[in-house]
């Protein structure tokens, strides 16, 4: 049973990757940071999740600097918009962290979520379930994942109120993708065909993730 904890990184054979889904507004949305631990066989374990509202600019900088000191991540993938680019630039200015911007489009968002699904279905992603906090976060993740599906019009969409945990995890997973790993491209699935087709069935949902 894996437990979420902000502890020390393992010395040998493990790498760490971070995904950040920032809040659009400080008072409405959740700011989510997810840390993945990846072993030499590309097995991935969620080792830290920070999900909070009302996170100010400087506070978020300090969160990521602390995570950087503890885990020494190979990469931080940060979902950016016009305002978030100022944040990632400042983070680069005050640290030596490898921060990459992820400019979100509908297509790119769907691609990273589909690739997250592929890792789950292949048994490569381990969810924390070892204590109450870990179970709560995992249950929220499952709930968000269950809201994603391909619609009758061929669009891959989430219909829940929030997708911040899924996006944070999907970004961390995308950061960890090595050149040897296969990566699903939506063009290959014809998800954006004008004529809807049953090309791909989302495995998300409570029946798609087993605990």
Write out the residue ranges for each language-model feature.
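Short, surface-exposed amphipathic charged segments that create phosphate/polyanion-binding patches used
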Residues: 112-122
């Amino acid at each position: 049973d894996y437990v979420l904890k902000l502890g020390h990184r393992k010395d040998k054979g493990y790498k760490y990757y971070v995904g950040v889904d920032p809040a659009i507004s400080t008072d409405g949305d959740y700011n989510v940071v997810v840390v993945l631990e990846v072993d030499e066989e590309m097995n991935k374990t969620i080792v830290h999740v920070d999900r909070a509202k009302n996170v100010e600019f400087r506070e978020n900088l300090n969160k990521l600097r602390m995570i950087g000191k503890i885990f020494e991540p190979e990469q931080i993938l940060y979902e950016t918009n016009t305002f978030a680019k100022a944040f990632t630039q400042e983070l680069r200015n005050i640290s030596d962290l490898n921060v990459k911007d992820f400019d979100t489009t509908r297509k790119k968002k769907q691609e990273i979520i589909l690739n997250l699904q592929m890792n789950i279905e292949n048994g490569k992603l381990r969810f924390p379930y070892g204590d109450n906090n870990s179970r709560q976060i995992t249950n929220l993740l499952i709930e968000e994942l269950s809201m994603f599906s391909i619609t009758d019009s061929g669009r891959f969409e989430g219909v829940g109120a929030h997708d911040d945990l899924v996006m944070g995890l999907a970004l961390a997973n995308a950061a960890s993708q090595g050149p040897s790993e296969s990566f699903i491209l939506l063009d290959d699935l014809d998800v954006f065909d004008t004529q809807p087709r049953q090309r791909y069935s989302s495995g998300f949902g409570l029946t798609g993730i087993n605990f």
